[in-house]
């Protein structure tokens, strides 16, 4: 079956198969998926942006490796009211869709930043535990 773990901004789904051990590549993919929406909103927060520009940045940062993941996430974020888009004529072909954050999206992103900071701090404490002074 599929279990859904919901952390304030992380929606991870893990396929559980008792006959197959969890492998490192799957674990890496799941960790990246958990921060993908946050990264997409962060990129859009810099100003209106074309989807292929987002894809290039996410791919070069090794956050996204599958192109088919971006468009469903953009649709979900738009349906949630976090972003909007506008069509801009292009001299080199059909009009292009440029994404922008809404006010609700800006507020949501600010909350995610706080969650990200907390999460980084928490994980850092686990990875680098402080030994108590005697």
Regions found by a protein language model. Name each.
Residues 1-27:
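Short, intrinsically disordered or compositionally biased N-terminal tails of bacterial proteins
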Residues 28-69, 88:
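N-terminal helix-turn-helix DNA-binding core of bacterial DNA-binding proteins
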């Amino acid at each position: 079956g599929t279990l859904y773990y919901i952390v304030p901004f992380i929606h991870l789904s893990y396929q559980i198969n008792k006959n197959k051990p969890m492998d490192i590549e799957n674990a890496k993919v799941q960790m990246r998926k958990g921060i993908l929406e946050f990264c997409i909103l962060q990129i859009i927060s810099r100003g209106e942006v074309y989807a292929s520009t987002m894809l290039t940045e996410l791919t070069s940062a090794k956050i996204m490796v599958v192109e088919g993941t971006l468009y469903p996430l953009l649709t979900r974020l738009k349906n949630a009211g976090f972003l909007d888009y506008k069509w801009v004529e292009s001299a080199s072909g059909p009009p292009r869709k440029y994404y922008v954050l809404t006010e609700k999206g800006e507020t949501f992103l600010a909350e995610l930043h706080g969650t990200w900071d907390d999460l980084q701090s928490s994980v850092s404490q686990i990875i680098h535990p402080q030994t108590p002074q005697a």
